[in-house]
Amino acid sequence: MSHDANTIDQRSHEGNLNKLGFWVFLTAEFSLFGTLFATLLTLQHGGDYAGKMTTELFELPLVLIMTFALLISSYTCGIAIYYMRKEKEKLMLIWMIITVLLGMVFVGFEIYEFAHYVHEGVNLTIGSYWSSFFILLGTHGAHVSLGIVWIICLLIQVAMRGLNKDNAPKLFIVSLYWHFLDVVWIFIFTAVYMIGMVFSG
């Protein structure tokens, strides 16, 4: 194991530049989700619900399962990065695989949730509130799915080439991306579901 004072994800100049670039990318992501949130919160008060009230449709147990899956995945991702910086490749791989599995649980339940709403006659086109709802959650879900694919690709690289100063910064960057999506979900859980379960229109 190297005794370099820097952790493995800090030993590549290119990797450090990529981290800086990713922070710039995240500001654009904040703007995107900020716009989607502002639209939904505006339509939450006075938007067209087409007679389909959130107080009747939202199911707390389902939302809690999704929330716990994503929040726990953030914790497991953090553990994976801890072991990455200790250069313990196998433990990093194990915890990242757990992160991916929890992410898949989240996406699976979100697909089930959307299918349930469609079965109840709710879709993207029936009212302005529901349009903003599906766009916000669909955008977040697509980002989570992208994150899962991204992590899997990096894990394949590590499995083939070993953990090194080139792929370690990428793992750190994807962990930032994953934590960002967890933060976005906390806002969704609070602003969309918690408010939606007690108020419609």
Curated annotation (Swiss-Prot):
Membrane spanning residue stretches: 20-40, 62-82, 91-111, 133-153, 180-200
Membrane topology, as annotated: Multi-pass membrane protein
GO CC terms, sorted: plasma membrane
Keywords assigned by UniProt, alphabetized: Cell membrane, Membrane, Oxidoreductase, Transmembrane, Transmembrane helix
GO molecular function: cytochrome-c oxidase activity
EC main group: oxidoreductase
Role according to the record: Catalyzes quinol oxidation with the concomitant reduction of oxygen to water.
Protein name: Probable quinol oxidase subunit 3
Native source organism of the sequence: Staphylococcus saprophyticus subsp. saprophyticus (strain ATCC 15305 / DSM 20229 / NCIMB 8711 / NCTC 7292 / S-41)
